[in-house]
């Protein structure tokens, strides 16, 4: 409870800066990217970022991170990258016309993106209820849906301009999950999946085969779970753990 009070107190302090940003012109050639609360260089944001770097020279793609290891690694690869709370990181968040995230606005610096076109690329398909469709989620509480929405816009997670969808079958659910109009859902598919349709294949499989020769490689790809409580999802007992 105390940490939440501190968090919202900080949001109140930043409110003037949140609205002052609207007076600063955006640069449509600056696109800012981030992923997983700034801690990873991965997922849909990374693949779209790399695509922009390779095929859109007119766009200045900038990666924002909270992780110094990513900062060093990205710069070695020639990717323009800044720490979330560095002066340049803040400045480019303010100036960017387009912001791309893969989980939440905290993937970049959520305090300095007011007035930008914010696109949530998301990180999967809603096979289970997420966001506003999940009646047990705190986002459906009175405090979040009324107080946070109107007084703490920095923290509010349902003011994206667009979200992406993997297919038409998921688009309606993405709209209701993020409280958006259907027209704000872009059926683009996952940028991270484009590699499966590309002539240039990802080298990850080749590296695994080299590391584990004469082995059968099985991918285990579970869905994300909010609960921190360990759960045994293997409910059947007709398998041998040693063989696995």
Language-model-detected regions and their locations in the chain:
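Membrane-proximal basic amphipathic "stem/tether" segments
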Residues: 1-38
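Charged/polar, solvent-exposed surface patches and flexible loops
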Residues: 11-15, 22, 54, 91-94, ...
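Short, functional N-terminal and low-complexity linear motifs
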Residues: 15-19, 137-143, 209
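Short secondary-structure junctions and interdomain/linker hinges
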Residues: 16, 23, 27, 99-103, ...
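Short, flexible hinge/linker loops that cap or flank conserved catalytic cores
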Residues: 25, 112, 157, 211-212
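Nucleotide donor/acceptor-binding cores
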Residues: 28-29, 116, 215-218
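Active-site and donor-binding regions of nucleotide-sugar-utilizing enzymes
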Residues: 30-199
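Conserved catalytic-core segment of nucleotide-activated headgroup transferases in glycan assembly
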Residues: 42-50, 176-177, 191-244
């Amino acid at each position: 409870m105390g940490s939440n009070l501190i968090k919202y107190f900080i949001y109140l302090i930043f409110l003037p800066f949140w609205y002052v940003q609207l007076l600063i012109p955006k640069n449509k050639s600056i696109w800012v990217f981030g992923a997983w609360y700034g801690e990873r260089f991965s997922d849909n944001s990374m693949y779209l970022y790399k695509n922009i770097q390779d095929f859109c020279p007119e766009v200045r793609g900038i990666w924002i991170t909270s992780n110094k290891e990513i900062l060093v690694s990205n710069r070695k690869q020639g990717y323009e990258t800044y720490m979330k709370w560095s002066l340049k990181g803040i400045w480019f968040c303010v100036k960017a016309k387009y912001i791309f995230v893969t989980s939440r606005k905290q993937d970049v610096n959520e305090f300095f993106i007011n007035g930008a076109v914010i696109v949530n690329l998301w990180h999967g398909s809603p096979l289970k209820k997420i966001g506003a469709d999940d009646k047990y989620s705190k986002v459906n509480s009175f405090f979040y849906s009324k107080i946070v929405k109107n007084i703490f816009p920095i923290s509010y997670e349902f003011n994206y301009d667009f979200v992406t969808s993997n297919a038409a079958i998921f688009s309606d659910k993405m709209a209701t999950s993020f409280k958006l109009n259907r027209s704000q859902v872009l059926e683009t598919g996952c940028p991270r999946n484009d590699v499966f349709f590309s002539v240039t294949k990802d080298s990850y499989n080749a590296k695994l085969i080299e590391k584990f020769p004469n082995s059968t490689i099985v991918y285990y790809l579970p869905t994300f779970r909010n609960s921190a409580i360990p759960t045994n999802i293997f409910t059947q007992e007709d398998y041998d753990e040693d063989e696995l």
